[in-house]
Amino acid sequence: MDRMQKDDILERLVAAEGFCVGHSRSEDTRAPQSCDHWSNPVLLERAAYLRKLARFGEGNASEVVKEYPGYCTLLSVHLRSSDAEVNEEFAELLIVLDGRATLITGGELQKAYRIGPGEHRGANISGGTMQELRTGDVIHISAGTPHQLQLACEKTFSCLIVQIAQAVHP
């Protein structure tokens, strides 16, 4: 995929105005309304590009689709199992676009280390619950919940992630 094609896909991902029925701009004093729409074919086309990046990198690739006040959307492609992680400051809503994986949630991170403010990673999870994920599934992971994606050998998993700011209260 050349640079022009990549830019065209990004433009279609971000320039979503006018796709939503029932959301029109009005001339009143309320805050402007908007609606962003990313079709499954456009997301899968972009995921194909990320899959190429993942092959030449560490086996996973992701990028921010769009940032909003209080949350952001990311496109993520996995060619291998991910590290276990805990995000203290945001919840995640995963929409599975393509593939299968096992999601482990809960339990405790093993060999944990800090990667940034409110973010920790680890080698794996001990004592978590396993769930099988498939294309079309929607998953909510609360802030502070350890989680990890495990893939079978030579499988690909693509998802849209909505990260939502959420304080964890003790």
Each language-model region and where it sits:
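An anionic, turn-rich surface loop/hairpin at beta-sheet edges
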Residues: A112-R134
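Short, surface-exposed beta-strand-loop junctions and turns on beta-sheet-rich folds
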Residues: L109-K111, K155-T156
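Conserved metal-binding segment of the jelly-roll/cupin
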Residues: E132-A152
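A short hydrophobic beta-strand segment most commonly corresponding to one strand
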Residues: E154-P170
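Short, conserved beta-strand element in jelly-roll/cupin
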Residues: E88-L103, G107-L109, I115-R121
